Structures are given as structure tokens and as C-alpha cells.
């Protein structure tokens, strides 16, 4: 990932 993690990864 670039800088910020997408929330979809933390909340499938």
C-alpha cells in the first residue's frame, strides 16, 4: 500500500 490503508482491508 502507498501511505494510507484502505478501510476495506481492515473491515472485510
Swiss-Prot record:
Activity versus pH, per record: Active between pH 2 and 12.
GO aspect biological process, one term: defense response to Gram-negative bacterium
Protein name per its UniProtKB record: Antimicrobial protein AN5-1
Organism classification: Bacteria, Bacillati, Bacillota, Bacilli, Bacillales
Top-level taxon of the source organism: Bacteria
Temperature curve summary: Active between 37 and 90 degrees Celsius. Activity is reduced at 100 degrees Celsius and absent at 110 degrees Celsius. Activity is unaffected by storage at -20 degrees Celsius.
Record's function text: Has bactericidal activity against E.coli ATCC 29522 and S.aureus. Inhibits growth of S.marcescens and B.cereus ATCC 14579. A synthetic peptide has antibacterial activity against E.coli ATCC 29522 (MIC=8 ug/ml), S.aureus (MIC=64 ug/ml), S.marcescens (MIC=32 ug/ml), B.cereus ATCC 14579 (MIC=64 ug/ml), B.subtilis (MIC=32 ug/ml), L.plantarum ATCC 8014 (MIC=32 ug/ml), B.flexus (MIC=32 ug/ml), S.enteritidis ATCC 13076 (MIC=4 ug/ml), Enterobacter spp (MIC=32 ug/ml), B.anthracis (MIC=128 ug/ml), B.licheniformis (MIC>128 ug/ml) and L.lactis ATCC 11454 (MIC>128 ug/ml).
Keywords linked to the UniProt accession: Antibiotic, Antimicrobial
Miscellaneous comment: A synthetic peptide has no antibacterial activity against S.agalactiae ATCC 12386, S.epidermidis, P.aeruginosa and methicillin-resistant S.aureus (MRSA).
Organism of this sequence: Paenibacillus alvei
Amino acid at each position: 500500500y502507498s501511505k494510507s490503508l484502505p478501510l476495506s482491508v481492515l473491515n472485510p
